[in-house]
Amino acid sequence: MAAIESVLTETRVFPPAEAFVTQANVAGMEAYQALCRRAEADYEGFWAELARQHIDWKTPFTRTLDESDAPFYRWFDDGELNVSYNCLDRHLATRGDKTALIFEADDGSVRTVTYKELHARVCQFANGLKSLGVGKGDRVIVYMPMSIEAVVAMQACARIGAIHSVVFGGFSAKSLFERIEDAQAKLIVTADESLRGGKAVPLKRAADEALAMGDTSCVERVVVYRRSGGEVNWSARDLWWHELTQTQAETCEPVWVSAEHPLFILYTSGSTGKPKGVQHSTGGYLLGALLSMLWVFDAKADNDVYWCTADVGWITGHTYVAYGPLALGMTEVIFEGIPTYPHAGRFWETIAKHKVTTFYTAPTAIRSLIKLGSELPAQYDLSSLRLLGTVGEPINPEAWMWYHEVIGGGRCPIVDTWWQTETGAHMIAPLPGAVPTKPGSCTLPLPGIMAAVTDEHGGPVAKGQGGYLVIKRPFPSQLRTLWGDPERFKKTYFPEEMGGKTYLAGDSAHRDDDGYFWIMGRIDDVLNVSGHRLGTMEIESALVSNPRVAEAAVVGRPHEVKGEAVVAYVVLKGARAVGDEAKDIARELRDWVGKEIGPIAKPDEIRFGENLPKTRSGKIMRRLLRAIAKGEEITQDVSTLENPAILDQLKEAVK
């Protein structure tokens, strides 16, 4: 690990503005440090007090943390609650007529629902699910466009104790099939099509394809929401959403579940083949969502209009669209489209139109919008903004400064948030009224999060020295296991080399002299493309499944917009392709990967070689491939290479 060096030096510091501090939920550094001291002095008491303060319990818990079967930690497990009740019912008396969701459709049209209306719709859909035999513990796949209905489907599952597994609408039929099969889903909720940038994307067709790919006899019904009115094939198991719900009652008693009951499974890319079904709990997850909204987003339910641009298919869309904001009774924007349709000012127009106060998006989106110039956002009134956030990958200091100056007018704090699908909620991020920010750093851990940078054995490393990012104590919102694979869970996140109880994030990081964390990248072979985690093994497997391909290796290289670009090295079964033939085959392989996994995984460039650089023991020299992809001079020892002559071939990229 000593080989990890930190080359990023950033010295600018932005203390919170006094006007922000005076109104902040956590006001000033002393208040932040007091929370941290409280957590260190009485760890269980700290979390128990917060859980009692912020969550409505049907049966109060008496046990806070059970570590007897570490690392399978249990939090508040004798308490009973319902997440949907906490997001909807508890607001009805005081906020029933308040707008809950503002749906900004792809074409710019707007629909809104109040808390009362959202509650009624969730109850109707929950009753519909019950009428189809769905109950506590059953798995429901949600393969939906960004919509009010996607949130309704998730909340309805939570209401009856069913376990949802949302699959991003951009994933292919094959990816969907793998998730249906692994979760043994009883029901699928989908739509005819999604609308994105003026184009219709068929979802029902992909669901039909997925269901025809293998043994999916576990699926009893497919509920279809009519989004576009596009043509769909129909079978006996299919049912329209509107027909299912129109006769259902608008009340549905919540099913009270243990705090440890699984709320959802969300699949994330692994560094080896099969996607990992990250399983989250009910009570601990909800607490993480609530606290991070209050602490990191400084949430003010009465005044804020909150907008997180993430799709519900990702963890960000779970915690910071479907659950966190609603648990606090906030008004939020849900966005169907893309930042540049029907025009390049769409994001800024949306902020101005709905008077958005808190805006949370990915560095990828920011970088792509920077390219369009600062004059564009200047055409819109962004004065309603008071807080900006970034998620999905580290933000480079230049993009941070543009975001701060051009979008935030130099007055909005930026919360650069580090967390993962597996952590459920923010882990390291500035509390905006307390912690001074530095462009490019996610700053300091949230109170109660015992984050550290260590060597491969869990030992300390010097300040400024790169190491493994770990969390030393269990925390309420962390994943409980990998669905159906407890051994992989232990091996991946709680390795024996670190004592079996320390959470290994899989990221490398260093801390500066102020203790601030700087994320340096993945320590495994997972790429971060536009804030989406993609396993290199999955892309390699997709390439090799093409009849032309004998062998493939995939690496990432820095990309100024997407964070990382996908670079594929391919050995064909026939002769090495060159010229126009290489371009044609590269195009075919890109489309192939898009069909197998999804468009997000398509290689940005493909390089053809007679073979791949391997050591004499047959191991692919990935470090060498990364250096070639980045255009770096090869300084490492290539004496163990079986065929050094191929290096020149691999330098020729087909874009």
UniProtKB/Swiss-Prot annotation:
<comment type="similarity">
    <text>Belongs to the ATP-dependent AMP-binding enzyme family.</text>
</comment>
<feature type="binding site">
    <location>
        <position position="530"/>
    </location>
    <ligand>
        <name>CoA</name>
    </ligand>
</feature>
<dbReference type="GO" id="GO:0016208">
    <property type="term" value="F:AMP binding"/>
</dbReference>
<dbReference type="InterPro" id="IPR045851">
    <property type="entry name" value="AMP-bd_C_sf"/>
</dbReference>
<dbReference type="InterPro" id="IPR011904">
    <property type="entry name" value="Ac_CoA_lig"/>
</dbReference>
<feature type="binding site">
    <location>
        <begin position="196"/>
        <end position="199"/>
    </location>
    <ligand>
        <name>CoA</name>
    </ligand>
</feature>
<keyword id="KW-0067">ATP-binding</keyword>
<dbReference type="InterPro" id="IPR020845">
    <property type="entry name" value="AMP-binding_CS"/>
</dbReference>
<keyword id="KW-0479">Metal-binding</keyword>
<keyword id="KW-0460">Magnesium</keyword>
<dbReference type="InterPro" id="IPR000873">
    <property type="entry name" value="AMP-dep_synth/lig_dom"/>
</dbReference>
<dbReference type="Pfam" id="PF13193">
    <property type="entry name" value="AMP-binding_C"/>
</dbReference>
<dbReference type="GO" id="GO:0005524">
    <property type="term" value="F:ATP binding"/>
</dbReference>
<feature type="binding site">
    <location>
        <position position="544"/>
    </location>
    <ligand>
        <name>Mg(2+)</name>
    </ligand>
</feature>
<protein>
    <recommendedName>
        <fullName>Acetyl-coenzyme A synthetase</fullName>
        <ecNumber>6.2.1.1</ecNumber>
    </recommendedName>
</protein>
<dbReference type="InterPro" id="IPR025110">
    <property type="entry name" value="AMP-bd_C"/>
</dbReference>
<dbReference type="GO" id="GO:0003987">
    <property type="term" value="F:acetate-CoA ligase activity"/>
</dbReference>
<comment type="function">
    <text>Catalyzes the conversion of acetate into acetyl-CoA (AcCoA), an essential intermediate at the junction of anabolic and catabolic pathways. AcsA undergoes a two-step reaction. In the first half reaction, AcsA combines acetate with ATP to form acetyl-adenylate (AcAMP) intermediate. In the second half reaction, it can then transfer the acetyl group from AcAMP to the sulfhydryl group of CoA, forming the product AcCoA.</text>
</comment>
<dbReference type="InterPro" id="IPR032387">
    <property type="entry name" value="ACAS_N"/>
</dbReference>
<feature type="binding site">
    <location>
        <position position="549"/>
    </location>
    <ligand>
        <name>Mg(2+)</name>
    </ligand>
</feature>
<dbReference type="GO" id="GO:0005829">
    <property type="term" value="C:cytosol"/>
</dbReference>
<feature type="binding site">
    <location>
        <begin position="392"/>
        <end position="394"/>
    </location>
    <ligand>
        <name>ATP</name>
    </ligand>
</feature>
<feature type="binding site">
    <location>
        <position position="316"/>
    </location>
    <ligand>
        <name>CoA</name>
    </ligand>
</feature>
<keyword id="KW-0547">Nucleotide-binding</keyword>
<dbReference type="Pfam" id="PF16177">
    <property type="entry name" value="ACAS_N"/>
</dbReference>
<dbReference type="GO" id="GO:0046872">
    <property type="term" value="F:metal ion binding"/>
</dbReference>
<feature type="binding site">
    <location>
        <position position="507"/>
    </location>
    <ligand>
        <name>ATP</name>
    </ligand>
</feature>
<dbReference type="InterPro" id="IPR042099">
    <property type="entry name" value="ANL_N_sf"/>
</dbReference>
<feature type="modified residue" description="N6-acetyllysine">
    <location>
        <position position="619"/>
    </location>
</feature>
<feature type="binding site">
    <location>
        <position position="533"/>
    </location>
    <ligand>
        <name>ATP</name>
    </ligand>
</feature>
<feature type="binding site">
    <location>
        <begin position="416"/>
        <end position="421"/>
    </location>
    <ligand>
        <name>ATP</name>
    </ligand>
</feature>
<keyword id="KW-0436">Ligase</keyword>
<feature type="binding site">
    <location>
        <position position="522"/>
    </location>
    <ligand>
        <name>ATP</name>
    </ligand>
</feature>
<keyword id="KW-0007">Acetylation</keyword>
<dbReference type="Pfam" id="PF00501">
    <property type="entry name" value="AMP-binding"/>
</dbReference>
<dbReference type="GO" id="GO:0019427">
    <property type="term" value="P:acetyl-CoA biosynthetic process from acetate"/>
</dbReference>
